[in-house]
Amino acid sequence: MEIISSKRFILLTLATSSFLTSNTLCSDELMMPHFHSKEGYGKYYQLRGIPKGVKERSVTFQELKDWGAKKDIKMSPAPANKVPHSAANLPLRFGRNIEDRRSPRARANMEAGTMSHFPSLPQRFGRTTARRITKTLAGLPQKSLHSLASSELLYAMTRQHQEIQSPGQEQPRKRVFTETDDAERKQEKIGNLQPVLQGAMKL
């Protein structure tokens, strides 16, 4: 019994001593860079410090007061009715009036510019024009042009082109989109039938 208890006692003392020494060594290692940095900072401060010929002087309260008064920014109130030049190109919600700023020539140029941007839009936003319709339909055989689907396709596409050219007449938006989607589906069907028809004409 005495042998077991002495072994336990020895193990306990070894464990505690190793634990305590590791803690003290770790804390010493953590503190060492701190001391070194303070010493290095002191040396650096002495090297980079104030030159010998220059003396430090204290700032008086009056100088601080004068310095603070110079730093105040004087703001003048802006005139209420004047619109700054930088606001000339802002949208209407920022106070620019389209009737005052734009001439009829500028308005016509703007409309022409928006019409020229239509070819980059997808088909359901009005990309197809009458020229494109005639080009696509000219490539189809004559028999398929007389069919009901191609005539409906031609009608839907020309009607869509007329709606783009005359935006003053308001059409129900949902109806225009459904007609355009139907026209796209019919055009895809005709495009799928075109190789078959060409093969039949060769025979």
From Swiss-Prot:
Q: What is this protein called?
A: Pro-FMRFamide-related neuropeptide VF
| Organism for this UniProt entry | Rattus norvegicus
Q: Which UniProt keywords apply?
A: Amidation, Cleavage on pair of basic residues, Neuropeptide, Secreted, Signal
Tissue-specificity statement: Isoform 1 is expressed at high levels in the hypothalamus and eye. Isoform 2 is specifically expressed in a region between the dorsomedial hypothalamic and ventromedial hypothalamic nuclei.
Family, per entry? Belongs to the FARP (FMRFamide related peptide) family.
Which residues are annotated as modified residue Phenylalanine amide in the UniProt record?
F94, F125
Region (Disordered) residue ranges read 161-186
**TM region positions:** none
